[in-house]
Amino acid sequence: SPEVMGKSPNRHNKLEMSVEPIGEDVRKFLKEEYEEVQRNADEQYEVRDALIEAGMDDEEADNILEVHEENVFVNASRGIKNLREIQEYLLDAFKEFCDEGPLAGEPVIGLMVKLHDAKLHEDAIHRGPSQMIPTTKDAMRKGFLQADPELIEPKQKLRVDTPTDTMGDAMTEVSNRRGDVIDMSEEGDSSVIKCKLPVEELFGFEAALKSATNGQGFFSLIDIIFEPLPRNLQEQTILDIRERKGMKQEMPSLEE
């Protein structure tokens, strides 16, 4: 996102921040390896080096203030007066934001938030948590909504075994449920289809597969992954989730 500004409710404090997606290799490292590396590291530079090896920029890795799930908060500023006094509030806001993102109150993953600058009131009483947490969330929300966020959905990677003569019918069942075929092979008289299917579409799949393959087809789970929901389903799904949660029945905007 471009650099955006968040203002405190009392108008005495301003934060300049930006939001961008984390590279897939870094995100995967944060998900699968970061906690173990941090737990076993004798020195902090070992964690830094592991992040750089995963693909993070040197300067970003040097200035991480917080890692939360698969998201990072980076201090990209050049010396902000009184930053230490408000840092705890900024990081609390960051974690709350990541736990309930602005699209539909769902968790956010793969996010890098950068703090570029801050203008803070001289008197500490005017830059407490009730001022700085909303300010931080305001800036992050503006940046997030300008960074082309997408709703992602869980999918299951499956192995489908079917007699070769009913393979086409099995593939039809997969495609009818927004599934994608990854690979096909033959093992003796059987065909093996490796595919991925949205979890939402799996209800009734086993019965449908049995019906399409004369009772001989079956599937097994390989892995669970997350991928962006198709563009044409994004808005309606977001609105449906917002309705279920009692949120405003409209897409989030910068003006909120």
Model-assigned labels for residue ranges:
Residues 1-256:
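Accessory interaction regions appended to the cores of large information-processing enzymes
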